[in-house]
């Protein structure tokens, strides 16, 4: 071998070594990437497994939570979350499989194949080089040519392998990012499906917590300066909050023996100490701890003044000031007849001569009842107790030195909102407050007649915000006149009136009721009274209809069971002997103008306020289940499967969607998709089903919005029908999906045994034979279907 050949050989060897070394470097980097990706891939598989474990834990929790007595839909939420977690598991598992198929395995195989080829080429070249060096001179030329040819081939092999490794590296990296892109797209798709459910669950929990916060009993952080409804709501199982009940029991005993109650102020330190005790929620124990009775009356006045709104607003009582003014004019001429008139009061339109001085009492009572009926229930309850205490103090005014005039000055402004926009000169005039004070005096005088004489043992409704507001009914008098008890002169008598204790010999009151009804509070007709009709009286029969009564015969009042307290013929005398007034049964006369109907509102219960939460649960379930049915549309492969889902939508539409549409008189806004006869039948079925899903959700959303805009306090027939329709639709969808899942399991088993596959509804088993026959049979009934079905079936007429 000459020098030139050896030099050329060395150069080629150097090129081969350089390429070989580069290949080894490429392989090292690629191997590192491949190993790291394999670890990441295993992590994704592990995350998929962990997600499945989380889903199983949630499912177990949801099954156990079904036995919990919770208003929060924890069972349904956990069940749905388990499904979401399984979806996430599938997404991670899918990513791991993509990385395995597109990245780690191809890269690993490329490294193995190319590295093996390079090593084989190098080994072959090395063996040939050794044989050439040992060959004889006769074969040297031939061996040299063979070696050079192999050397070129090996170099070309190295170059090809290097290029293959580089291409594989780039393609693998790009494929990995395509896998990530697919992963994130699937994640976004899954999250978009559950995002609305998540928002709805948040809304339900928020609404539930709001209701729970208003309904539950809790230790208040503040009592003074907040709404009276909130104070009553804290102890909804009691007629009065505990601190108010203790205060009134104490005042009942002490006010009749204490001079200047409500007028004399208490010391600042003792007043603040009692206020702080009330704020803390601790028992007051007034009889044992209070030395100064004026401290108790002062803290009651402080509580009343600190209310955001007075018990009676000016715009409420201002229209009744004329009643007080007219009463003052009548009293000037009828002072000597007050005792007789109070004994002969016939509430709301009595028989007798209404033009006389005593006859005006019926009108006064009616107007005062109407005034009280405009107040919220808790305002009525508190006002009654205050007026009873004032009435007691007035009865014992010789000791208390507090007659009605004094009481109207010191306590009236704490109950009735002061007259607004008074000028300085008006305040100095006594006549400015004459009607104001007279109205307060009338309320105290007639406290036992303007308030019902049944117990108020439960203030459940007071805890319900907004609805306790104006509990009214349209009536003037009760179905039978109750005896009027004398004013209580002892705690026992007052207690008997408040609790309805029939054991008291001086009272004839109904037994205590177990729950709060509208009859426990003042219920007055807002219509006008005909004071000139002297021959009729309005009474309420058992069926709730006020009929025109014939003039009652003269009655003789029975002797009172207990003697009334001593009275003097003054305008402040409110003592009333117990009498029994016998009123004959009224005759029915529907054409008389005095005929009135009572439209009593049924009491709202806690469940009435939780109805919107139940509706939100129904709405979430319906939306979710319809979405699951929609997901089956993607898997339709045959016309029969599509017709199976169409029949399912048809059943839902006929039985549930069409009634809702008729209830709302709703017209769909979503336009029908254009259809072409040239399109594939399965594709047309899918498009039709997607459109059906969209208009179904459109109607459901509109119905839900309509329900949310309705009033809880006054539920309409529309809202009741929507609630019932949603409940039934939720049940039928759950049952249908359960049937579909069972059929899927059966079909999967048949597939494993060599049978068919596919997705259909529970009606799909009855669909067989020629597709056109199915289409014809469906089209033949199009004209009799609801608009929702017609939109589906009409577009399949060419199948």
UniProtKB/Swiss-Prot annotation:
InterPro entries: AH/BAR_dom_sf, Rho-GAP, Rho_GTPase_activation_prot, RhoGAP_dom. GO terms for cellular component: cytoplasm; plasma membrane. It is found in: Cytoplasm. Residues 472-520 have a biased composition (Polar residues). One of its GO terms (biological process) is small GTPase-mediated signal transduction. GO terms for molecular function: GTPase activator activity. Residues 525-549, 743-752, 759-791 have a biased composition (Low complexity). The record marks 263 as: Arginine finger. Residues 550-568 have a biased composition (Pro residues). Residues 226-451 form the Rho-GAP domain. Pfam families: RhoGAP. SUPFAM superfamilies: BAR/IMD domain-like, GTPase activation domain, GAP. Disulfide bonds: none annotated. Keywords: Cytoplasm, GTPase activation. Residues 472-572, 741-799 are annotated as: Disordered. PANTHER family: RHO GTPASE-ACTIVATING PROTEIN GACI (PTHR23176:SF102), RHO/RAC/CDC GTPASE-ACTIVATING PROTEIN (PTHR23176). Rho GTPase-activating protein involved in the signal transduction pathway. This is Rho GTPase-activating protein gacI. The gene is gacI.
């Amino acid at each position: 071998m000459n020098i030139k050949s050896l030099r050329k050989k060395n150069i080629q060897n150097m090129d081969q070594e350089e390429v070989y070394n580069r290949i080894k470097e490429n392989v090292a980097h690629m191997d590192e990437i491949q190993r790291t990706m394999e670890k990441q891939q295993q992590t994704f598989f592990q995350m998929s497994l962990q997600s499945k474990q989380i889903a199983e834990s949630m499912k177990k929790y949801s099954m156990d939570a079904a036995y919990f007595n919770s208003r929060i839909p924890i069972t349904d939420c956990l069940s749905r979350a388990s499904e979401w977690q399984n979806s996430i598991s599938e997404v991670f598992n899918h990513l791991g499989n993509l990385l395995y198929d597109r990245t780690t395995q191809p890269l690993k195989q490329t490294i193995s194949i190319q590295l093996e080829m390079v090593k084989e080429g190098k080994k072959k070249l090395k063996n040939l080089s050794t044989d050439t060096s040992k060959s004889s001179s006769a074969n040297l030329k031939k061996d040299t040519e063979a070696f050079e040819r192999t050397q070129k081939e090996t170099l070309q092999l190295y170059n090809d392998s290097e290029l293959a490794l580089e291409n594989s590296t780039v393609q693998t990296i790009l494929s990995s990012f395509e896998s990530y892109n697919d992963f994130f797209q699937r994640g976004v798709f899954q999250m978009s499906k559950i995002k609305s459910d998540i928002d709805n669950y948040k809304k339900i929990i928020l609404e539930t917590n709001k209701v729970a916060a208003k309904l539950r009993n809790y230790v208040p952080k503040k009592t003074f300066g907040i709404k009276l409804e909130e104070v009553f709501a804290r102890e909804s199982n009691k007629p009065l909050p505990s601190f108010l009940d203790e205060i009134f029991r104490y005042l009942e005993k002490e006010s009749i023996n204490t001079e200047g109650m409500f007028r004399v102020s208490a010391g600042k330190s003792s007043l603040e100490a009692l206020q702080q005790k009330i704020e803390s929620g601790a028992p007051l124990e007034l009889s044992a701890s209070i030395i100064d009775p004026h401290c108790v009356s002062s803290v009651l006045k402080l509580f009343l003044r600190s209310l955001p709104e007075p018990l009676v607003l000016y715009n409420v009582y201002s229209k009744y000031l004329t009643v007080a003014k007219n009463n003052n004019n009548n009293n000037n001429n009828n002072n000597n007849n007050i005792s007789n008139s109070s004994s002969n009061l016939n509430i709301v339109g009595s028989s007798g001569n209404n033009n006389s001085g005593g006859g005006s009492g019926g009108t006064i009572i009616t107007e005062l009842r109407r005034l009280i009926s405009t107040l919220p229930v808790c305002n009525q309850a508190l006002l009654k107790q205050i007026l009873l205490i004032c009435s007691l103090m007035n009865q014992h005014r010789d000791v208390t030195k507090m007659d009605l005039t004094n009481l109207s000055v010191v306590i009236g402004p704490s109950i009735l909102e002061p007259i607004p926009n008074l000028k300085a000169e008006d305040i100095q005039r006594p006549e400015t407050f004459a009607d104001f004070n007279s109205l307060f005096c009338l309320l105290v005088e007639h406290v036992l007649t303007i308030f019902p004489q049944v117990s108020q043992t439960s203030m459940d409704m007071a805890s319900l915000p907004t609805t306790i507001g104006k509990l009214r009914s349209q009536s003037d008098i009760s179905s039978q006149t109750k005896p009027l008890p004398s004013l209580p002169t002892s705690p026992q008598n007052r207690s008997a009136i408040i609790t309805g204790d029939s054991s008291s010999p001086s009272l004839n009151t109904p037994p205590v009721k177990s729950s709060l009804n509208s009859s426990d509070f003042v219920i007055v007709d807002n219509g006008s009274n005909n004071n000139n009709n002297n021959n009729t009286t309005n009474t309420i029969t058992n069926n709730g209809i006020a009929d025109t009564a014939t003039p009652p015969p003269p009655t003789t009042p029975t002797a009172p069971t207990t003697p009334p307290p001593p009275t003097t013929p003054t305008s402040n005398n409110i003592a009333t002997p117990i009498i029994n007034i016998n009123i004959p049964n009224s005759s029915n006369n529907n054409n008389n103008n005095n005929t009135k109907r009572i439209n009593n509102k049924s009491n709202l219960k806690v469940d009435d306020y939780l109805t919107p939460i139940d509706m939100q649960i129904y709405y979430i379930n319906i939306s979710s289940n319809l979405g699951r049915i929609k997901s089956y549309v993607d898997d339709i492969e045959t016309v029969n499967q599509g017709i199976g889902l169409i029949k399912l939508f048809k059943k839902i539409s006929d039985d549930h969607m069409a009634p809702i549409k008729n209830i709302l008189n709703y017209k769909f806004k979503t336009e029908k998709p254009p259809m072409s006869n040239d399109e594939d039948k399965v594709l047309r079925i899918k498009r039709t089903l997607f459109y059906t899903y969209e208009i179904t959700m459109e109607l459901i959303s509109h119905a839900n919005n309509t329900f949310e805009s309705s009033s809880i306090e006054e539920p309409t027939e529309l809202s009741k029908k929507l609630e019932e329709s949603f409940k039934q639709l939720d049940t039928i969808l759950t049952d249908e999906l359960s049937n579909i899942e069972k059929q899927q399991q059966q079909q999967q088993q048949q597939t494993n045994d060599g049978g068919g596959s596919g997705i259909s509804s529970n009606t799909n088993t009855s669909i067989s034979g020629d597709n056109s026959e199915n289409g014809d049979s469906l089209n033949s009934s199009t004209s009799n279907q609801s608009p929702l079905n017609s939109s589906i079936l009409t577009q399949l007429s060419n199948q």
